[in-house]
Amino acid sequence: MAEQEGSGLQMLLHTLQNSSDKASTLSILQVLGDLLSVGTDRRIYYMISKGGSEALLQTLVDTARSSSPDWDILLPLFRLLAKVGLRDKKFGQKALELEALDVTLILARKNLSHSQNLLHCLWVLRVFASSVTTGAMLGINGAMELLFKVLSPYTRKHTRTIRAATEVLAALLKSSKHLRRAVNRGYVNSLLRLHQDWHSRDVTNTYVTIRHGLLLCLRHIVALRSGREAFLAAQGMETLFSSAQTCLENKNMELVISAVIQILRQCYPASRLPLVTASSAYTFPAPGSTSSELPLNLTEEDFDDDGDEEMDKDSDVEAVKEDDDLETDLSKLSSKPGLDLPEEELAQYDAMCPELSCSFEELEPKCGDDLNNKDTLHANHHHIPSVASLRQHCFNREHSSWRQEREDTVHSSILHMVKTGKSGVPSSSKQRSATNVNQSLQQNGLEIDSSGHDTSDIQAPLEQAAWDMEAISCPRITASFPNSTKPEESIGAAEKLLHTHAKHIPFHDPHLYIANAMRTRSAVGFKTMAFPDLWGHCPPPAAQPMLDRKLGVQRIKILEDIRRLLHPSDVINKVVFSLDEPRPLQGSISNCLMFHSKFESGNLRKAIQVREFEYDLLVNADVNSSQHQQWFYFKVSGMRAAVPYHFNIINCEKPNSQFNYGMQPTLYSVKEALLGRPAWIRTGSDICYYKNHYRQNAATMDGALGKRYYTLTFAVTFPHNEDACYLAYHYPYTYSTLMTHLEILERSIDHREIYFRHDVLCQTLGGNPCPLVTITAFPESNSTEHLEQFRCRPYQVITARVHPGESNASWVMKGTLEFLVSSDPVAKLLRENFVFKIIPMLNPDGVINGNHRCSLRGEDLNRQWLSPQAHLQPTIYHAKGLLHYLSSTGRGPVVFCDFHGHSQKKNVFLYGCSMKETLWQAGCTVGESALLEDVSYRTLPKILDKLAPAFTMNSCSFLVEKSRASTARVVVWREMGVSRSYTMESSYCGCNQGPYQGLQFGTGELEEMGAMYCLGLLILELKSVNCSHKLLARASSLLNADVLEHYLQRCSSSSSNSSNRTSEVDDEPYCMEEIDYSADSSSDAEQNFTELDRQIQECALNKDEEEEEKEEGTGWRRRSVT
């Protein structure tokens, strides 16, 4: 049947080429037109495969070269040619070979006064122009001159023809040769005048497509330097800026506004950042480097988070690059367990693992070790709280005992917190779903006293004490809160304030924090503490939804940037804060906000007031680096209440951000904390993230083209006058906070049951101890059997915070630590059957000094795992050494997991390692024997997908990339043979699936994920074939047997959203407004031929209609365009 259809079509085409009878030719064209006007494009592609393009082109040439071309034939023929040519990739080459290009141009020139004939010629020229080869020939043969004759002078007659001419011209101007020709011939002025004619006279916005077509021509022209110069000389910036103001609020003008904005962005002169140098304001004389040395040979991978595919994936080219990065060398993919350290060096790790060799007496806590005093007793808890209960406790004005509250729920295990399904909500989380939160709370999360009680009793002593707000909000590390009116009382001010406004926060003690902060060493010697870190944080009473982005917010910000260029006198441009200035600037500056960032984890380098309530901010690069500007954390004070302040962070590096997809920065108000609501909350409106006009100095990049920067802009309305507020990229978690947390944990546990050991893995380059925590259960007795079971427990290794800016990893780790020492039956089982070795912060120096990614040497420590050196990367060297030591004793970890944060995707997910999946993805064909591997690496992610509300299997990946060869995940997998070696990524933003869909992550959700990870480890063990009957029996006795069986079966069922290979899905749709402004953007309307198809179809249905349109109004002078 198919052969008959093919032969029938070929017969039609053959007859068409050889027929000299007009009626027969018209009949065949009618049949072909009817065939191609219905159904799918498959019919057109089938016709192309049977020589349809050649037949139509040959018919065109034969008809056009006759003494009197018959337009009754040419019109339907042109329509068919345009329709077929859009789908034929070789259409241009075929047209050149058959000389159809020349005859089409000749016909167009002869029909300038016949709009219907000319319109059809232009449609086919539009198809020719989309081909590089035929487009070049059109330019050589004078097509642009022909088009300008059609476009000028301005007229409202034949508007469909004018529209078609603009589209052909826009397609031609994608060629650099045509661009230069257009600039040299003065067409820039002509196009500007034409656009202004249409803009000023099209008052009803009837001809938006023509105006858009002219703007596309200009957009291509300004992509060329000479084109931009001509455009600027013709006052193009001022002209288009003025025209944009008149139509911003008109939704029907979206095409025009978007094109204008892109042209203005393209023409904004590139400039250097307002910094003395791109290098960090902080330096450190690290071994092997000098303070002025910058990292060389930077690659795109240096800007990626571990496992992050941070770059946009909008094209097939990016996909090809990703596939090229896949490791295909079997020798590098194969696991090769072995030691790269001498055995004598491994002996140093004996002291870090006393549980393997010490006697029972040596392990027992000494009499003085029981530190459960009245200050920390209530910090002990019996199981990790759900997000809702944690919030409820933190904002409970009755200050009920934490211990008592936990005792009330001791019989309720973490199992009650797991998600009930992809669309379900955990029972403990129902109350915290996005409820009807007060509008002001949604915006700032601050104005409402969550307890519902009157706050006057707290506010009164605050006012009576008349504290110096600046001193309170950023106290000196000496624990002094100076009071300007009563200096003699300054020494006891801190104690007095803490006593007056005491509010218990679980696992936090300001007194201990001060002590730890005094011991912390920074590169520049910080002398102040951030108030939120001292005072503490409680999750807000309700989950905060993602911010709905308003359409047009980005273009408004960009137009404000353009306004600065065009009207510089309107800009204040006053530096109000700078780390580069030898003396503080703000003492003599008034009528502006005051900024501060010289505290632990703080990052703000410079603040410039540009308008009364608007500031440009620049964040500091990592120490000894000129890169990695993302993390920010600073104090701002001196504000007015109920006034929107706009902040523009102008030196961001990432090409996209979750700030474009609902994420908000975090804010902590000192006054709110003193009023009993100490919380980091998501805040900000009018948020967007886009490429700006700043460029890094090429000299900084070793002569390479200077890197472009991005702007994060947001508005904050502060709740109180003269408050002091802290703003941060994400919820901060400092090194001193960690050390305080570990100390409180150690004090709060029952040392008769829980073996908790806090060691020092090593000293960092900055002189700070890197903590190593061991958690397990004490042996039941000192009998040989119990001691043997104790020493034979398998190990679980968890690390975090190798990248300082990923503070969410620390909050997940906090949840893990608190759960493991809790009285939850699951935690008890885990302690009895595993030894947990935890390094909660692999990069203390980076965290302390406000880095985003690097160590004090300016290098990414997660790219140093292949061959770390003790004097250069001590924490990585000893972490790897400890892992090698465990492997050498036959105690390699069951699971290794490195906690990270992810800035481009939502949810929580794992990256693992699979040789088979990597080779499959890369398209490599190898023998079956080479593909044999342990597939258990998929089990834990599948379990977490069933249990953890924030986790999704869909985003997990198990590919091994060349660029990740030196990361912890890959090195532990390859060198130590740990098949379950993972990176766990937590979004900075929130969830787009499951119970938390549409909500931003708070610290409660992150801590909950840390606890859920532990539950996943237990389920993994219970499901394993080697699970002992004793453990199963113990689990049944501690947990509800029916409930346990339910979850074991549930985690054994196949995941509905996973298969043999889980494909990674795009996390976000295209942004509503273009982040970039490249001239060849795929969103250009001329790239989409659907509209041209529609025009052709419409013309075919109304071919008897006259297209002539009368000019509206009289007396308009037609302006000639030259």
UniProtKB/Swiss-Prot annotation:
It is an enzyme of class 3 (hydrolase). CDD domains: M14_Nna1 (cd06906). The gene is Agbl1. Residues 299-313 have a biased composition (Acidic residues). This is Cytosolic carboxypeptidase 4. It catalyses: (L-glutamyl)(n+1)-gamma-L-glutamyl-L-glutamyl-[protein] + H2O = (L-glutamyl)(n)-gamma-L-glutamyl-L-glutamyl-[protein] + L-glutamate; C-terminal L-alpha-aminoacyl-L-glutamyl-L-glutamyl-[tubulin] + H2O = C-terminal L-alpha-aminoacyl-L-glutamyl-[tubulin] + L-glutamate. Zn(2+) binds at residues 803, 806, 900. GO terms for cellular component: cytosol. Disulfide bonds: none annotated. Its main location: cytoplasm. It is found in: Cytoplasm, Cytosol. Pfam families: Pepdidase_M14_N, Peptidase_M14. PANTHER family: CYTOSOLIC CARBOXYPEPTIDASE, CYTOSOLIC CARBOXYPEPTIDASE 4. Its cofactor is Zn(2+). Metallocarboxypeptidase that mediates deglutamylation of tubulin and non-tubulin target proteins. Catalyzes the removal of polyglutamate side chains present on the gamma-carboxyl group of glutamate residues within the C-terminal tail of tubulin protein. Specifically cleaves tubulin long-side-chains, while it is not able to remove the branching point glutamate. Also catalyzes the removal of polyglutamate residues from the carboxy-terminus of non-tubulin proteins such as MYLK. Binds 1 zinc ion per subunit. GO terms for biological process: C-terminal protein deglutamylation; protein side chain deglutamylation; proteolysis. InterPro entries: ARM-like, ARM-type_fold, CBPC1/4, Cytosolic_carboxypeptidase, Pepdidase_M14_N, Peptidase_M14. The active site is at 985 (proton donor/acceptor). Widely expressed at low level. Expressed in eye, muscle, pituitary, testis and to a lower extent in brain. Belongs to the peptidase M14 family. Coiled coil: none annotated. Gene3D superfamilies: 2.60.40.3120, Leucine-rich Repeat Variant, Zn peptidases.
